[in-house]
Each structure stands twice: as structure tokens, then as C-alpha cells.
Amino acid sequence: MAIVLRTVDFSETSLIVTLLTKDLGRISALAKGARRLKGPFEGSLDLLSVCAITLIDKPGDTLDLLTESKLRRRFRGAQRSLERLHAGYYIAEMLRLLVDDDDPHRELFDMTLSAMGMIDGEGHVAKTLLAFDAQCLRLLGHSPATQRCTVCGRDAERSRRRASFSLVGGGVVCENCRPSQSHLMTASWDALDALRELASEPELPPSTIDADTDNPSQPPSTAFPIGRLFPAMTPAIYRDLRGLLNRTLESLVGQTPRMQPFLPDKLDSL
């Protein structure tokens, strides 16, 4: 199974396709004939389409060859609203920036399917993107520290209304260590509490523990119920947390994602 993250024209008839796969991680492959009107890929290579693929592994720096792709689920966010379309584009961009080539993360794949299902359906866009970002950080080993100081390791006291947060250290900094640190921002403790919930591991109902996400008829949230992570929050907490995640991700990838300005600026974004 694979999710289409990007396509780039290679020739008059072919594409270079970037895919997030469940078993191989992020890969790039050459899809010969994909630009033909009646090509061999049956319209399965649209952005964020979920497809079953067949690859020929090429040695060295040569691109793998994508020989077959069968559409399993098409992303239809654009038919719902511009905001849902932008959310889908943001997910694709962040996966390209955060995930290394040939580094499989099966749980990340399941989480992405779940987030896309929420955006493609009736899910809350703003909260889904918060959970997506927080889970990307957790699953890729960058989950922010929200309770213990990233410098000394002690519990950070909540003596101030807002906590100091290190973009370099990836978490809170206590009052004793704060003067020696740079690249700090502040965040409310309520926002950090919400982040901790969003970055937690979701509990699976017993009936879905062995769910098979390769089954296209199965709801995309079955294997990773991302909607269970949504905490209660006020508009002020949302703005604070959205800003914290934006700055954290910028620091991690070394740039401002192109789709970041199009993220929901209000909590009530559906």
C-alpha cells in the first residue's frame, strides 16, 4: 500500500512519483507512461491517492520502476472545501520533509491514513492537523518534552503563567536553566497539556487491534483512531499550540513549509 505524496514530470509520457509506503517508507519511482491519457496506472497517481503498487527495485542511484498501481481510495477533500484541500497538501508536504527515504514507519502510515480519512470526511480539520503534527513528532522520535526540563531533567515548576520552550532542545526549560538557553519561545501550560494528549499513543478498541489497513473497504481510522486523541481546548489554546507546533517543525526541517500559511487560523474550522 502507498500514498502518493508528489508527482514530477520526467518526460512527455512519464512521471517521477514520491510515495509513502507502509513497508518501505518514503520512496521515489519512475512511472513510465503515467502521463498518457490511456496510461497503465488508471488515474491512481493523483496527489494523496491510496494505491496498491508493484515495484521493480533498481540497484544503486537508479530510480525504482513503478510497474503497476491500482487505486484503492481517492482523496476528495477538494470537493468538500478549499480548507480540506489545503490540509491534504500540508500533510503531503510534511511527510516529504520529515520522513527519510527507505525508512519504514508502519504506524506513521496508519496514522496518515486516519488523518486523511478525517479530512476527506466529516472530521475536524484544525484538530486533525494538530494531532497529525504531534503524532509525526512522536512516531519519528521528536516528541516534545512538556513536563521535564530538557536541560537538567527535573520537573518544570509552573510558577509562571507561560512556560519557556526550547526549539533546539525540543521541550520545556525550567526557570533555573532558562538564562543559559537560546532559541526559546513561550507557550501556555494549557497548550502544553493539550500537546501531551495529542502526542500520546491512542488506545485501540479490542475489536480493532488486529485491523488490516491493506483492506480498502475498512474505515481508514480503524488501525489508528486519531480522533480519540482530540483534547478539549479553547480558541486561545489552539492558537498557542498551533504556533508552538509551527515553530517546532520549522526548527526541525530547517525551513517554513510552503503550506503552513494556509493552515486553519481558527479552532472552529471544519
Swiss-Prot record:
The gene is recO. InterPro entries: ARFGAP/RecO, DNA_rep/recomb_RecO_N, NA-bd_OB-fold, RecO, RecO_C. GO terms for biological process: DNA recombination; double-strand break repair. Keywords: DNA damage, DNA recombination, DNA repair. Residues 202-221 are annotated as: Disordered. Belongs to the RecO family. GO terms for cellular component: bacterial nucleoid. Pfam families: RecO_C, RecO_N. This is DNA repair protein RecO. The keyword Lipid metabolism does not apply. It comes from the Bacteria. Involved in DNA repair and RecF pathway recombination.
